[in-house]
Amino acid sequence: MVEQIKDKLGRPIRDLRLSVTDRCNFRCDYCMPKEVFGDDFVFLPKNELLTFDEMARIAKVYAELGVKKIRITGGEPLMRRDLDVLIAKLNQIDGIEDIGLTTNGLLLKKHGQKLYDAGLRRINVSLDAIDDTLFQSINNRNIKATTILEQIDYATSIGLNVKVNVVIQKGINDDQIIPMLEYFKDKHIEIRFIEFMDVGNDNGWDFSKVVTKDEMLTMIEQHFEIDPVEPKYFGEVAKYYRHKDNGVQFGLITSVSQSFCSTCTRARLSSDGKFYGCLFATADGFNVKAFIRSGVTDEELKEQFKALWQIRDDRYSDERTAQTVANRQRKKINMNYIGG
């Protein structure tokens, strides 16, 4: 029987974000800048990562508490060896209705078919520019946008449902909004533009670098005829619109200008096995990995997860001001540990 639990602000638990690795083959400035994550950076050793059996056990217990959706994140999750084994395990859990994966897309041709065969049907590909030169300057690994576009074409050809995520930074890639909308509209692929967020400690975020949803919408309406789309479910993070001529949808994620804390239903497990109730968490998370490895039963694990959720009161984006950003900037968990 599924228990219905809510946090201190009355929010149910519906989603679990599982970070499977802290490693990535890109060095995007807003997530893992090369100046910090250089060639000598020490990533987590394998024994510090949760095993797939541990992740599946955690997911099963969370399903009994109301989780219906699981998203696999990183780092770059396709760098975790044998990820299809985890997908297959998660697909066998009663109550889990949807498994998604967020990736930079570079390794889709290498691993996509195995993941599809294991039961993965839905992926989000992070792609912050369609211009090759600009994209290379963003990822700092000399990877061309055309390379990722080819990987996306491959993913759709094997049956994966693909959405594209774009983090927009003022003066960096805001000129990519219109060409990317045009490209993916013609491909009938949903694209979502995300306001630049102050996740982690190393991305140099401030308000002046944010292109708000209203600014994006004004730009878009000068080039396309669109209609708004009603939200599909409680907790949907994107504001969706539909192109009038062919019905393809796109989304704007208002993580800064119009926060969605009040409907956030996500629990997050970092790559080092810690629970966090918020993407912008500052305190050190509860060490689920150590708790599991201490020999607890599933019932004890469930009671701990219940307690963690019931004391949750995170609403950082609701409270974000220049001062709170300054006060918390050096204390947040980095994005490569917790995913997006």
Swiss-Prot record:
Q: Which GO terms describe its biological process?
A: Mo-molybdopterin cofactor biosynthetic process
Note on how the cofactor is bound: Binds 2 [4Fe-4S] clusters. Binds 1 [4Fe-4S] cluster coordinated with 3 cysteines and an exchangeable S-adenosyl-L-methionine and 1 [4Fe-4S] cluster coordinated with 3 cysteines and the GTP-derived substrate.
* Any Pfam family matching the protein: Mob_synth_C
Chain residues that bind [4Fe-4S] cluster 2 = 261, 264, 278
A GO molecular function held by the record:
metal ion binding
Reactions catalysed, as given in the entry: GTP + AH2 + S-adenosyl-L-methionine = (8S)-3',8-cyclo-7,8-dihydroguanosine 5'-triphosphate + 5'-deoxyadenosine + L-methionine + A + H(+)
Domain Radical SAM core as annotated: residue spans: 8-227
Record pathway:
Cofactor biosynthesis; molybdopterin biosynthesis
Q: Where does [4Fe-4S] cluster 1 bind?
A: 24, 28, 31
Q: What is its EC number?
A: 4.1.99.22
Q: Where does S-adenosyl-L-methionine bind?
A: 30, 75, 126, 197
Assembly mode:
Monomer and homodimer.
Q: What does this protein do?
A: Catalyzes the cyclization of GTP to (8S)-3',8-cyclo-7,8-dihydroguanosine 5'-triphosphate.
Query: What family does this belong to?
Result: Belongs to the radical SAM superfamily. MoaA family.
Q: Which HAMAP family match?
A: MoaA_B
State the name under which the record lists this protein. GTP 3',8-cyclase
Q: Which organism is it from?
A: Staphylococcus aureus (strain MRSA252)
Q: Which lineage is the organism of this entry classified under, starting from the top rank?
A: Bacteria, Bacillati, Bacillota, Bacilli, Bacillales
